Curated annotation (Swiss-Prot):
One cellular-component annotation, GO: chloroplast thylakoid membrane
Organism lineage string: Eukaryota, Viridiplantae, Streptophyta, Embryophyta, Tracheophyta
Biased composition (Low complexity): 34-44
Gene that encodes the chain: ndhM
Oligomer and partners: Part of the chloroplast NDH complex, composed of a mixture of chloroplast and nucleus encoded subunits. Component of the NDH subcomplex A, at least composed of ndhH, ndhI, ndhJ, ndhK, ndhL, ndhM, ndhN and ndhO.
GO molecular function annotations of the record: oxidoreductase activity, acting on NAD(P)H, quinone or similar compound as acceptor; quinone binding
Organism: Oryza sativa subsp. indica (Rice)
Protein name per its UniProtKB record: NAD(P)H-quinone oxidoreductase subunit M, chloroplastic
Function noted in UniProt: NDH shuttles electrons from NAD(P)H:plastoquinone, via FMN and iron-sulfur (Fe-S) centers, to quinones in the photosynthetic chain and possibly in a chloroplast respiratory chain. The immediate electron acceptor for the enzyme in this species is believed to be plastoquinone. Couples the redox reaction to proton translocation, and thus conserves the redox energy in a proton gradient.
Keywords: Chloroplast, Membrane, NAD, NADP, Plastid, Plastoquinone, Quinone, Thylakoid, Transit peptide, Translocase, Transport
Membrane topology: Peripheral membrane protein
Catalytic activity: a plastoquinone + NADH + (n+1) H(+)(in) = a plastoquinol + NAD(+) + n H(+)(out); a plastoquinone + NADPH + (n+1) H(+)(in) = a plastoquinol + NADP(+) + n H(+)(out)
Length: 220
């Protein structure tokens, strides 16, 4: 995890998917009923194939424009939710399958739960919150400013997917976009590799050295 920041918590503005039709839910979220298990598996395979195809496509020209529009709608930097000192570790309720929703990529961990940054209490019953863990292996050197940029992008993406189904697929879309954003920060020179990292494998490409071409002597 980035040593300069705590886990970032954002309100989840996504739609919850019920597991049992007769269960009651009082949160202000739309409800969707799942298909049978076989259809779930087929849909998951299809979604993974679609995600792989999307990641291989070049970014659309209007991507930067949409990003600027999301930042315009957001007033000021993203702020984390307040800490809950009395939070306890709880499993997700049975109506949602009793297992957490999460997205795990190389530098991003997203959980549909509340995680106390001090006690590490993992409350999965608070599905109206998303917790972001940034760079848990410390592959990059982070500052407060660069961490805040990732948090702002995370909040913008959550707002962008408002109303979408709260599922692992949606969280993977957010996580994939954040990975691309981190790569952009690296290529722009805003972050750099942590040469003291426990695992040094340059997952986003080998370091680039900038030099002044005018200082290269002519070969005669």
């Amino acid at each position: 995890m980035a040593t300069t920041a705590s886990p970032f918590l954002s309100p989840a503005k996504l739609s919850l998917e019920r597991r049992l039709p007769r269960a009651t839910w009082t949160a202000r979220r739309s409800v969707r009923f799942p298909p049978v298990r076989a259809q779930d598996q087929q849909q998951q395979v299809k979604e993974e194939e679609e995600e792989a195809a999307v990641e291989n496509l070049p970014p659309p020209p209007q991507e930067e424009e949409q990003r600027r529009e999301r930042k315009t709608r957001r007033q000021g930097p993203a702020q984390p939710l307040p800490v809950q000192p009395l939070a306890e570790s709880k499993n997700m309720s049975r109506e949602y399958g009793g297992q957490w929703l999460s997205c795990t990529t190389r530098h991003i961990r997203i959980y549909a739960a509340y995680i106390n940054p001090e006690t590490n209490a993992f409350d999965q019953t608070q599905m109206d919150k998303l917790t972001l863990l940034l760079d848990p292996t410390d592959e990059f050197v982070w500052t407060d400013e660069t961490c805040q940029k990732v948090y702002d992008e995370f909040q913008d993406l959550v707002d962008h997917y408002e109303g979408a189904e709260l599922s692992e697929y949606t969280l993977r879309l957010i996580g994939s976009d954040l990975e691309h954003f981190i790569r952009k920060l690296l290529y722009d020179g805003e972050i750099k590799y942590n040469m003291m990292s426990r695992v040094l494998n340059f997952s986003m490409g080998k370091p680039r050295i900038k030099f002044n071409s005018s200082q290269i002597p002519d070969v005669k």
